[in-house]
Amino acid sequence: MKIYTVENLPGVNYEVLGTVTGSTVQSKNFISDFGQSLKNIVGGELRAYTQMMENARRLSTERMMAQAQALGADAVIGVRYSTSAIMAQAAEVLVYGTAIRYK
């Protein structure tokens, strides 16, 4: 299944099936979080958090695609990602788009 960030596919005939979403809330464990706190003092990339967010985006995308497949979709257009802090050291990644079926 393809996902597109564009709002529509010019020249392609398709039927809109509806909005699909995927989300996850992730946090780091205490030991990893402590290590990242020390890294934050001296500066630089917080690799454990980068990896956590990459995993969260992947999982959210998989959940959105599963929802689209359940509708019989061929693709998802208008895909957008949103992140928000839920609490200290926890973040939500939400992905959403419009499921379509080619005619």
Show the residue positions of the predicted features.
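Short, well-ordered alpha-helical segments
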Residues: 20, 33-78
